[in-house]
C-alpha cells in the first residue's frame, strides 16, 4: 500500500470495510476512557480515527500525539455508532479503526489554536504557514485557483493566447511609483517592475497575435489600503479589431462564466451601463454600490441665495457642490447617531454634517426639525422637500463644499448608513450581486501642483472619436473610450480602447506636456510600432485578488493571497524587506543615503 490511498476528507460510506492509508495533521486528540480519538485533517477535510488499546504499540504512539503532529494512519473504515454521526462532515457517518500509526513529524506547541477566530492579523501573518492550514484559508486559496482556471478556460475557448511579458522593464513614471531594480551590468541604470503589461500587450497586438491574455503579477510602490498590495495579480487581456461594445460584451460574459462555474452565482444577463458623469451625480463615486438604495439629490442651484453661508458659499463657487441624501425612516436616528455620522464624514474632509428631520411634510417648514431651517427661505425649503421626495419620518443629510469633498464624504455616508444595522432593518440595502459598467470617463485630470493635465486612466487610452479636436483646444472636455466593471461598490476590472495611430498618441503626449524629445526617450518604441499598421485594439485587466475577496466574503485581499504584505509593505513571515550587506551594494554601485530623522 502506498503512503496515502485517499484524502482524509474523502473517506465516506462507500469505503466501509476497506483498508485505507491516510496522511495528515492532528486537528484534535481526545482520550475517552481508554480509547483515543484523533481528528485527522488534510486539505479535503477531517476524518475521525479511533485508537483502541488492543494494539499496544499503536496505542502507545497515539498517547504521545498532540495537535499538528503529521501522521500516517493505516486502518479499516467502519460506521460510527448510532448517535455519534456528524452531518457537518463528508466523513461524518464513518470512522477509521486504526491498526498502525506512524508519526511522520512531531510538532512543537502551536502559538495559537487553528480554530481561533479572534486572532490578530499580525499573529496570522507572522505565523502564516500555520494560518494557511485553517479551513477558511484553504477554501480561499482553492477558490482563487478555480477562478483562475475558469478564466483561462473561457479565454482559451475564444482563441486568446497566454503570452508572458517581461518582469524587468523600463521605468515610465506616469502615475504610481515604480519598484526599481538596479542593473549590476549597467552601472547607474535601473529596471522597473511592471505596474501592468500595458505597453507590451499593445505591442503584441501590433505584432498580429490578435488576442492575448496573461494572469500576471504587477507592482506598485504606493500607500496601501484594505484592497491594495504592492504586488497584485491581474487577469490581463487585449484584443484587436473589436469595438468598445464588443470588448465589454466579451468580458462581461467571462465574468458571468467565472461566477457561475466557481460559486454557482448567476449574474444579470445584461449589466447596466452608466456614464461616469451620472455615477458622480447620483452616487458621488465612479464605483457605485447599487445594492444601497440611497441617492444624491443635487441642490446647488436651489441654495445659491440663502442666508446660510455654509450652503451659499460653495453653491456660488466654480468647483463647489451642495447635495443631500434622504434616509427613509431616518427620523428614528438619535442625536448620538447623528453626531457619530458627523465625526465620520470629517474623515473625508467635510467640516460638518447638516441635517433636517421631516416630522410632517404637510406643515411645510413648521413640520421640519433642524437648526438650519431658519436660515433657508421658503423656495429653498420647498425645493429640498420636493427634489428629495421627503416623507414624514425621514431625515435629510447635506454636504456642501468643493465637489470632491461632497462626493467623498456624502458617498461614504451613503454606504455607511445603507450597510448599517439601521439600513438593513429598514430595507435600505439589498443582498446579492449588482454589477454595472461605468463608461465615458474624463480623458484628463488637472494637477494643481504641477499646473498641467495628467492622464485620468493612462496616456494610451483613446479619446472618443468626436472629442479628438479637444486634445489641442480644450483637454478638460475630452472624454475617453474607457470603461470600468464595478461590482457591489468595487472596481473589479478596468480597460479602454487604445490609441492605435501615432499622430493621435503624439497629440495626447503634447496635451500632457510631454514634449517630442521626452516622448521619444520614454515611449519611442511604442510610437515607432504604431507606424507599422497598428490595428485598432483594446482590452481590460481584472483584479484577481479583488474578485476572489468578494466571492469568499473576506474582509481583506490579504485573506485570499498566500503570502501577502502588511499595510507597511512588509512580509512578517520572512521579514522582507531587509538590509543587504555592503558587498552587494558595491556590486550594484549603490551608496545609501538614510532619510533625516523626523523631529
Curated annotation (Swiss-Prot):
Residues annotated to bind L-aspartate: 174, 220, 457, 498
Keywords on record: Aminoacyl-tRNA synthetase, ATP-binding, Cytoplasm, Ligase, Nucleotide-binding, Protein biosynthesis
CDD domains: AspRS_core, EcAspRS_like_N
Subcellular location: Cytoplasm
CC terms in the record's Gene Ontology section: cytoplasm
Region listing for Aspartate, in residue ranges: 198-201
Keyword presence, Ligase: yes
Organism superkingdom: Bacteria
Gene Ontology terms for molecular function: aspartate-tRNA ligase activity; aspartate-tRNA(Asn) ligase activity; ATP binding; nucleic acid binding
EC number: 6.1.1.23
Marked site positions, Important for tRNA non-discrimination: 32, 83
Family: Belongs to the class-II aminoacyl-tRNA synthetase family. Type 1 subfamily.
UniProt subunit comment: Homodimer.
PANTHER family recorded: ASPARTATE--TRNA LIGASE, MITOCHONDRIAL, ASPARTYL/LYSYL-TRNA SYNTHETASE
Descriptive protein name: Aspartate--tRNA(Asp/Asn) ligase
Organism of derivation: Paraburkholderia phytofirmans (strain DSM 17436 / LMG 22146 / PsJN)
Encoding gene, per UniProt annotation: aspS
Amino acid at each position: 500500500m502506498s503512503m496515502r490511498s485517499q484524502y482524509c476528507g474523502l473517506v465516506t460510506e462507500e469505503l466501509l470495510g476497506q483498508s485505507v492509508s491516510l496522511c495528515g495533521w492532528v486537528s484534535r486528540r481526545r482520550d475517552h476512557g481508554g480509547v483515543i480519538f484523533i481528528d485527522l485533517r488534510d486539505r479535503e477535510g477531517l476524518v475521525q480515527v479511533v485508537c483502541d488499546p488492543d494494539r499496544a504499540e499503536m496505542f502507545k504512539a497515539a498517547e504521545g500525539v498532540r495537535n499538528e503532529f503529521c501522521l500516517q494512519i493505516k486502518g479499516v473504515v467502519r460506521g460510527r455508532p448510532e448517535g455519534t454521526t456528524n452531518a457537518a462532515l463528508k466523513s461524518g457517518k464513518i470512522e477509521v479503526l486504526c491498526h498502525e500509526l506512524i508519526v511522520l513529524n512531531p510538532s512543537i506547541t502551536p502559538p495559537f489554536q487553528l480554530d481561533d477566530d479572534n486572532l490578530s492579523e499580525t499573529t496570522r501573518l507572522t505565523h502564516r504557514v500555520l494560518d494557511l492550514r485553517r479551513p477558511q484559508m484553504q477554501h480561499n486559496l482553492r477558490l482563487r485557483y478555480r477562478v483562475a482556471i475558469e478564466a483561462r478556460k473561457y479565454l482559451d475557448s475564444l482563441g486568446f493566447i497566454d503570452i508572458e511579458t517581461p518582469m524587468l522593464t523600463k521605468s515610465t513614471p506616469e502615475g504610481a511609483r515604480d519598484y526599481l531594480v538596479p542593473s549590476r551590468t549597467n552601472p547607474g541604470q535601473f529596471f522597473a517592475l511592471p505596474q501592468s503589461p500595458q505597453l507590451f500587450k499593445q505591442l503584441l497586438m501590433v505584432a498580429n497575435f490578435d488576442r492575448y491574455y496573461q494572469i500576471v503579477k504587477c507592482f506598485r510602490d504606493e500607500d496601501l489600503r484594505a484592497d491594495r498590495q504592492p504586488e497584485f495579480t491581474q487577469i490581463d487581456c487585449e484584443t484587436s479589431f473589436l469595438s468598445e461594445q464588443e470588448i465589454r460584451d466579451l468580458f462581461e460574459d467571462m465574468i458571468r462564466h467565472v461566477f457561475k462555474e466557481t460559486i454557482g452565482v448567476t449574474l444579470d444577463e445584461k449589466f447596466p451601463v452608466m456614464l461616469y458623469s451620472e455615477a458622480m451625480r447620483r452616487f458621488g463615486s465612479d464605483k457605485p454600490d447599487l445594492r444601497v438604495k440611497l441617492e444624491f439629490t443635487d441642490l446647488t442651484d436651489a441654495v445659491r441665495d440663502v442666508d446660510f453661508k455654509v450652503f451659499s458659499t460653495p453653491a456660488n463657487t466654480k468647483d463647489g457642490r451642495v447635495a443631500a441624501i434622504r434616509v427613509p425612516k431616518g427620523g428614528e436616528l438619535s442625536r448620538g447617531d447623528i453626531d457619530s455620522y458627523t465625526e465620520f464624514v470629517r474623515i473625508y474632509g467635510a467640516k460638518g454634517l447638516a441635517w433636517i428631520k421631516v416630522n410632517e411634510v404637510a406643515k411645510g417648514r413648521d413640520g421640519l426639525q433642524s437648526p438650519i431651517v431658519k436660515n433657508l427661505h421658503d423656495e429653498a425649503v420647498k425645493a429640498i422637500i420636493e427634489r428629495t421626495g421627503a416623507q414624514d419620518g425621514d431625515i435629510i443629510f447635506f454636504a456642501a463644499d468643493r465637489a470632491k469633498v461632497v462626493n467623498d464624504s456624502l458617498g461614504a455616508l451613503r454606504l455607511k448608513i445603507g450597510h448599517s444595522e439601521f439600513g438593513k432593518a429598514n430595507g435600505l440595502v439589498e443582498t446579492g450581486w449588482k454589477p454595472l459598467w461605468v463608461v465615458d470617463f474624463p480623458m484628463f485630470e488637472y494637477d494643481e501642483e504641477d499646473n498641467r493635465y495628467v492622464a485620468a486612466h493612462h496616456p494610451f487610452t483613446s479619446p472618443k472619436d468626436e472629442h479628438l479636436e479637444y486634445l489641442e483646444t480644450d483637454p478638460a472636455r475630452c472624454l475617453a473610450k474607457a470603461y470600468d466593471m464595478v461590482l457591489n461598490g468595487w472596481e473589479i476590472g478596468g480597460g479602454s480602447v487604445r490609441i492605435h495611430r501615432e499622430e493621435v498618441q503624439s497629440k495626447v503626449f503634447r496635451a500632457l506636456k510631454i514634449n517630442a524629445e521626452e516622448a521619444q526617450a520614454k515611449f519611442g518604441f511604442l510610437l515607432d510600432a504604431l507606424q507599422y499598421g497598428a490595428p485598432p485594439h483594446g482590452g481590460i485587466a481584472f483584479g484577481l485578488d479583488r474578485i476572489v475577496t468578494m466571492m469568499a466574503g473576506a474582509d481583506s485581499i490579504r485573506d485570499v493571497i498566500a503570502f501577502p504584505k502588511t499595510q507597511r509593505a512588509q512580509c512578517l513571515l520572512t521579514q522582507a524587506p531587509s538590509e543587504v550587506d555592503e558587498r552587494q551594494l558595491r556590486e550594484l554601485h549603490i551608496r545609501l543615503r538614510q532619510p533625516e530623522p523626523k523631529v
